[in-house]
Amino acid sequence: MTGRLFTSESVTEGHPDKIADQISDSVLDAMLELDPTSRVAVETLLTTGVVVVAGEVTTTGYVDVKDVVRRRIIEIGYDSSVKGFDGHSCGVMVAIGGQSGDIAQGVDTGHESRTGSVDAMDKQGAGDQGLMFGYACDDTDVLMPLPIVIAQRLAEQLTAVRKDGTLPYLRPDGKTQVTIEYDAENRPVRVDTVVLSSQHDEDTELDTLEADVKKHVIDPVLATFPIPSEGYRLLVNPTGRFVVGGPMGDAGLTGRKIIVDTYGGMARHGGGAFSGKDPSKVDRSAAYAMRWVAKNVVAAGLATRCEAQVAYAIGKAQPVGVFVETFGTGVVDDERIQEAVLEVFDLRPAAIIRDLDLLRPIYAKTAAYGHFGRELPEFTWERTDRADALRAAAGL
């Protein structure tokens, strides 16, 4: 082992915890499609042969939750008992009730409105207390840490070669892990280790799997990154066999992959999961907003690394605190960058929802392969549209 080695992991959409995330977000999307003002908090548990969906909801629409669950499982690829789980025949239990009126009153009429404010953005209070972080760095062109970006792309490619028939013996469950060497200036310099585990059918030998995965998944992905990878250590299915997988191998639960969902451990995390939550829940919307903030700080050239924290009190619109840190990479003081952030970004929940257009059925797409670093049209928090305003506000 040489150098300073940082590691991040990802999982495929067929990992049990990720199936749970995708089910929760698919239910959320179905409700938002019928009623964009739906309040949704949905959790999913799945194990051998059964799925349980529970939570609290306020909506004017009717959603056939069992149908949403089955369609998502089948789309992921669990469509036969031969694979250990079958969306056609698995049991689906639904236990969804109404949202607490005590919570609703604080969200519907924020503390500021109740104490005299007439600003429309003060009307909606935060759906809970809590702290959320956003992060960005210049490791990659999407301003994300390199280890998590490579791990996510490997997981995506592993799924792609399964679904398009390139490697038909693969099954949906899988994990990736990437170790990158960093130099003394925190710059990525070399791929050190790649770990990839993939569920497969009964008849596939490890030597075949390793050769195929290296050829069709790992080497093509590594070739897209401008960092040396010659001589990297490769570990494919280190247990030697991965036939039993998915919910048959491990129970899955919504919100169990919060580091995979974010920055691969390179940044702090407030602890709140995303999936199954509508944007009135600041666990989700404010984390997206702080990614937007941090990415724009780096895109503006104010720093090469930025982490931004925001915190809320339940029922209150204005954050109780904001903290911006650039780890010594800022071109001006962190305090000045923080002042610029507060001048350019409105971090009240209603303003975040408005500015990022979050009342849309976009969330199932976020639930696998990372909420950040994928510059898709729906991922409005990946825009760098405030970079010029930040530079001006910082006096540059």
UniProtKB/Swiss-Prot annotation:
Q: Which cysteines are joined by disulfide bonds?
A: none
Q: Where is this region: Flexible loop?
A: 99-109
Is Nucleotide-binding one of the keywords UniProt gives this record?
yes
Q: What is its EC number?
A: 2.5.1.6
Give residues annotated as binding ATP. H15, D173, G174, K175, R241, F242, D250, R256, K257, A273, K277
Q: In which pathway does it act?
A: Amino-acid biosynthesis; S-adenosyl-L-methionine biosynthesis; S-adenosyl-L-methionine from L-methionine: step 1/1
A GO molecular-function annotation = ATP binding
Record keywords: ATP-binding, Cytoplasm, Magnesium, Metal-binding, Nucleotide-binding, One-carbon metabolism, Potassium, Transferase
- GO-annotated biological processes: one-carbon metabolic process; S-adenosylmethionine biosynthetic process
Record-stated family: Belongs to the AdoMet synthase family.
Give the protein's recorded name.
S-adenosylmethionine synthase
Species annotation: Nocardioides sp. (strain ATCC BAA-499 / JS614)
Lineage, uppermost ranks: Bacteria, Bacillati, Actinomycetota, Actinomycetes, Propionibacteriales
